């Protein structure tokens, strides 16, 4: 499938056998691809043991991994932490939602929780497996007018949705209280030298020290060197404290991210000094060390050894905190430069007296080609696979060729689709002159387009569609060029990690894209042009009990239902019914408006338009229940009232009667937003909007129940025959 091929080529996930990794880059891939929430580092710890097995590593009861080389003085300890921030399940609600406690509870940026809202996650089971889940997020459609909108930063408003309907469903899946939870794994190449993704700042030290261990295994260097991969660094440095108590080294080098000097900021009211730029080399965090032997740029940071219970550990006089510059730290789009990793590795090898490892990092990155189209199906395609194909196609408003072509390929061979001047894909049954009914779903999705290229290599973006900036800023992105796809990150402004910052409520606030370039010329060298479009990566995940989650279910579910209905109607269906897959809905129903106007001018306005689009469900703990919920798993929804239309009550009842006749589960309700059918009303048509319940609309965590999709396809088929 499209996303699977993309993920193998561009979104780099964990490799199956850590021991095979031989370069810093290859180590980095599986290290970042392994979840290791503080206190739950077991899987990563064991992979490190496997990677080091030829060197006789030791592993203690809390997962610290150590390996020693050489003999005599001085005794150097070079340590790095392997844990990452995350959450642990603290309670399971009767309706299947998970409540969580954060690990660590303090010390993270003020908006850390908010940036997890409406994002894909991985939750661990008792058996050590990982299951997909999402964090609940507020929908922009239901927020206007609310007096007390839940604070997205407050962990009391954090709910995890794994698709379960009951506590028993959760427990049957293997998830329980104490299950760890962390962001879904992805590592993205950005430009020729940068990597971006979750836990980048928590794993680069391990990638460096694995290389150092291999060099020492070949040539031990001078004195004694102990390399340690320590756990629970976010929990008052418990792993490092234990190793220090055991080793009593003469010198200590800690390799890892820096912490902001929070106490100093509180005293002075100042912001912490910015780190050196990416690509400028290794850095010394905190107090510089002339004894280390390599010059490093110094940057202030809080001490890496955090005091817990008991007396403080006395560090040797010769102690250094070494690292690399990080951009957007502690976010899903956290970024570093592999040239800095090389510089740090060379410095460490010089320090211990072993051979320098030549860089094996790739000097350039090419765009990932778009996959070849799938073959046309010879029989009715599976509804879930149809949905996967359509959701994993990318098509921002105004650039919808990919999903339109995907729909066309999925249609049966006996139909003859046409495309109008607005880009709408049309299938006509009957004589086609004046259809009695039009069914319409839109092909576009939220995203951005490149508005301009700045002198510093950043890209100014135009927003296409509406959604919360907190769901997109600071997250990995894909830039779609004429040659293929490039990795990028939707940039965060300076000061995003301070309490003064707040995400804007309006998605139309301009966003910026980081493509790993330092100038406009470097952008041009990557093949990027004004007008290229940008999306957030996506992959359809199957959750518990028949539910799925992926961005762009709005409105690829509607598109899927119509594809299924066309197949079900068959080649001998001759009623005057038209199916339209419309464009630019997210920009104001523009494709639908063009079709409606053209139909009116031709005297072909239909009597009824069935606009098929999302019912933004309040079936979540975060939304106001003054709306009829539109519960997942209980059938399609007659979208009786929204921001653009009121369906005549008699038509609501008529749809429900046809549904009941065919035992199709049906609901009706009130929601927000607009629908394509509203553009036909001025010309005399009745807009009868059909929907399915969707949680977390306009976010990366959109979530549905496949039973509702089947019900939607069934009612479209039935209405085509009987309305």
For each feature predicted by the language model, list its residue ranges:
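N-terminal hydrophobic/helix-forming segments and targeting peptides
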Residues: 18-723
């Amino acid at each position: 499938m499209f996303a699977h091929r993309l993920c193998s080529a561009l979104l780099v996930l964990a490799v199956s056998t850590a021991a095979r990794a031989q370069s810093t880059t290859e180590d980095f891939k599986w290290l970042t691809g392994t979840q290791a929430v503080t206190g739950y580092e077991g899987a990563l710890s064991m992979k490190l043991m496997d990677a080091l097995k030829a060197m006789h590593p030791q592993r203690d009861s809390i997962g610290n991994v150590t390996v020693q080389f050489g003999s005599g003085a001085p005794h150097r300890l070079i340590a790095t932490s392997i844990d990452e921030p995350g959450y642990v399940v603290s309670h399971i609600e009767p309706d299947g939602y998970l409540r969580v406690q954060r690990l660590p509870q303090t010390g993270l940026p003020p908006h850390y929780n908010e940036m997890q809202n409406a994002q894909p996650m991985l939750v661990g089971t008792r058996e050590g497996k990982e299951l997909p889940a999402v964090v609940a997020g507020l929908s922009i459609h239901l927020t206007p007018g609310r007096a007390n909108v839940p604070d997205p930063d407050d962990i009391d408003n954090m709910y995890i949705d794994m698709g379960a309907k009951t506590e028993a469903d959760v427990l049957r899946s293997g998830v329980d209280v104490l299950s760890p939870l962390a962001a879904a794994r992805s590592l993205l190449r950005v430009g020729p030298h940068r990597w971006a993704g979750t836990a980048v700042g928590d794993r680069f030290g391990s990638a460096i020290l694995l290389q150092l261990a291999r060099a020492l295994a070949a040539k031990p260097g001078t004195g004694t060197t102990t390399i340690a991969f320590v756990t629970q660094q976010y929990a008052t440095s418990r792993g490092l404290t234990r190793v220090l108590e055991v080793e009593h080294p003469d010198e200590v080098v800690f390799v890892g991210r820096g912490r902001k000097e929070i106490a100093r900021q509180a005293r002075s009211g100042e912001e912490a000094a910015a780190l050196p730029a990416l690509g400028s080399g290794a850095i010394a965090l905190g107090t510089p060390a002339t004894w280390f032997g390599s010059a490093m740029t110094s940057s202030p940071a809080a001490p890496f050894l955090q005091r817990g219970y008991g007396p403080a550990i006395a560090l040797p006089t010769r102690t250094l905190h070494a690292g690399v510059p990080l951009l957007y730290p502690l976010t899903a789009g956290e970024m570093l430069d592999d040239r800095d990793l090389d510089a740090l590795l060379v410095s460490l090898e010089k320090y211990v007296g072993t051979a320098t490892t030549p860089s094996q990092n790739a000097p350039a990155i090419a765009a990932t080609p778009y996959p070849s189209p799938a073959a046309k199906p010879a029989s009715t395609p599976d509804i879930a696979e149809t949905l996967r194909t359509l959701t994993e196609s990318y098509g921002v408003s105004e650039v919808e060729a990919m999903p339109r072509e995907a729909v066309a390929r999925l249609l049966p061979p006996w139909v003859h689709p046409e495309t109008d001047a607005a880009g709408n894909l049309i299938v006509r049954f009957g004589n086609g002159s004046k259809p009695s009914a039009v069914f319409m779903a839109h092909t576009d999705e939220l995203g951005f387009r490149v508005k301009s290229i700045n002198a510093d290599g950043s890209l100014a973006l135009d927003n296409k569609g509406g959604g919360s900036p907190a769901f997109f800023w600071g997250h990995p992105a894909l830039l779609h060029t004429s040659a293929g796809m490039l990795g990028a990150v939707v940039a965060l402004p300076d000061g995003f990690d301070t309490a003064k910052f707040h995400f804007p409520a309006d998605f139309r606030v301009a966003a910026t894209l980081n493509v790993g370039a330092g100038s406009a010329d470097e952008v041009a060298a990557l093949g990027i042009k004004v007008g290229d479009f940008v999306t957030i990566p996506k992959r359809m995940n199957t959750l518990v009990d028949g539910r799925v989650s992926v961005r762009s279910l709005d409105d690829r579910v509607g598109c899927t239902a119509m594809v299924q209905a066309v197949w079900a109607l068959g080649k001998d269906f001759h009623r005057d019914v038209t199916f339209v897959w419309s464009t630019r809905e997210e920009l104001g129903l523009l494709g639908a408006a063009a079709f409606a106007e053209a139909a009116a001018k031709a005297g072909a306005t239909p009597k009824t338009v069935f606009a098929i689009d999302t019912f933004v469900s309040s079936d979540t703990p975060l939304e106001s229940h003054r709306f009829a919920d539109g519960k997942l798993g209980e059938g399609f929804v007659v979208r009786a009232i929204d921001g653009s239309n009121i369906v005549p009550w008699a038509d609501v009842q008529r749809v429900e009667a046809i549904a009941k006749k065919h035992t199709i589960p049906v609901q009706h309700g009130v929601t927000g937003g607009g629908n394509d059918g509203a553009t036909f009303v001025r010309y005399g048509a009745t807009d009868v909007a059909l929907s399915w319940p969707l949680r977390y609309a306009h976010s990366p965590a959109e979530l549905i129940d496949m039973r509702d999709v089947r019900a939607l396809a069934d009612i479209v088929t039935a209405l085509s025959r009987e309305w």
